[in-house]
Amino acid sequence: MSKIRVVITGAGGGGANNIISTIKEREKYDLIGFDISPYKIARANVDSRFVVPPASSPDYEEKICEIINKEKPALIIPTNDPEVEKLSEIRNRLKTELFFPDHASVALCLNKWKFHNFAIENGIRVAETYHVKSLEDIEPIFSKFNSELLWCRAIKGAGSKGATKVKDSEQAKWWIKYWNEMRGMQISDFTISEFLPGKDFACQSTWKDGRLILMKAAERLSYIEAASRPSNMSSSPELAKTVYDTNLFDFCIDAIEKLSDGKAHGNYD
């Protein structure tokens, strides 16, 4: 019996390697690894590997389509936000399957400010949040809160990119100016919101044609490289424990069904 060919992007990285090791437990799959780094892809436990351009490159689409046309995988699994966004955009050109929500849902979920507005409009409870359009907005934003700590973060990006706790407007200005001057981000790429104390949960689910297949949740107990991060936090846990919380599940199901108009399909995190 011929094996099912599956592409894993970001192969060689921690998240992708977890997926690879899990799929490798079953012998019916032939894994193809993609990554932008020849060094990282070299350590991926895959059957074949390709160095590809970054998703932001104008050559990305052509190269990906070329490899897919040649290797003929049944499925491609991206493991980072830039490739999720780009592959979703070009899905009609790809001669393979993408187990994705519709593109409108993908684009909305990759923009935290747009998703916040969607949530408010649809009665989904979220932290009070304001968009920073200029540095002059920051002080008036702080005046709206009566909190010791606020949360300043980038609108797009994973792994808590550009995110930290701030206690006053000067700290927020410094933080945003740093990312603007040193990392090339725009002032308008940031939001400031209330910082929610308490436990920190992640919830992942798989849906097919509007039907929930699997949902699992975990409480983040500690964070990868937390000591070296200004916020002492990350969306990537070093240690987490599985939890079963029907209130959490109900909240996530409600949000996903509103996001997908009852037609959820793919993986939601």
Regions found by a protein language model. Give the residues of each.
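Residues that mark the start of a beta-strand
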Residues: 3-7, 149, 191
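Short glycine-enriched loops at secondary-structure junctions
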Residues: 35-38, 81-83, 104, 209-212, ...
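Active-site nucleotide/adenylate-binding loops and adjacent lid/helix of ATP-dependent enzymes
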Residues: 106-190, 197, 209-211
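Short, charged, surface-exposed secondary-structure boundary motifs
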Residues: 42-44, 60-62, 107-113, 160-162, ...
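Flexible loop residues that form catalytic
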Residues: 54, 81, 134, 155, ...
